[in-house]
Amino acid sequence: HMVRRFLSQKKHENITFNFHQLHTRTLIEGLKQEQFDVVFCSYMENEPDIRFIPIINQDMVIITPPGHPLTEKSSVVLADLEEYPLIGYDRTSGLGKYCKGIYSSHGISPKVTCECPDEHAISALVAEDFGIALVADVEDIHEQNVKILPVSDVHLVHTVYLAHMKDQFMIPAVKNFIQFIRKEGTHL
């Protein structure tokens, strides 16, 4: 939506974007190799040459198939994830590493039966009763036949960042886009 708002301005109508859906590590390497001007990604530590601008906070929620036993509970806690097969994010992705850190810091060991690249794939498998999942609350999960349950014992938030090289030449269109996102695109 942010890109659409940017392009809807008359002064930006001749700017084009190329979109790629890749893991954070691959996107960061692409920035370093000048394949990309900017990327939307998770935060990565130990990247001193990259500026990470937080732009969106996404609540993390548990999704289940309709009629799942968790939908009958008055509240769902993070430890409930241990009781059922879990569909997870790809372990090498930003969200995969984030979720693994959540599980570790809360002392739980879910039974991950399958890993997927994104919420669309995860929610499709959950809808088909392959398991439950902890996911970012994004539009894709609302389009599937799943129940969306808030985690009641801890508030979990994943932040999406706009990232770019700190000391690299940028054409005016890229500078304008970054400035636009900083001014109008952040939803924290």
What are these regions (language model features)?
Residues 1, 85-106, 170-178, 188:
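Secondary-structure junction motif
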Residues 1-48, 115-116:
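Central regulatory/effector-binding core of bacterial HTH transcription factors
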Residues 8, 79, 159, 163-188:
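Extended ligand-binding regions for polar small-molecule ligands
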Residues 15, 31-40, 60, 108, ...:
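Alpha-to-beta junction loops
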Residues 28, 32, 52, 78, ...:
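Short hydrophobic/charged patches on amphipathic alpha-helices used for structural packing
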Residues 47-60, 64-86, 172:
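Flexible hinge/capping segments at coil-to-helix
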Residues 47-54, 58-59, 73, 120-167:
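Beta-alpha-beta core module
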Residues 65, 72, 89-90, 112, ...:
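Thr-Gly-centered strand-to-loop micro-motif
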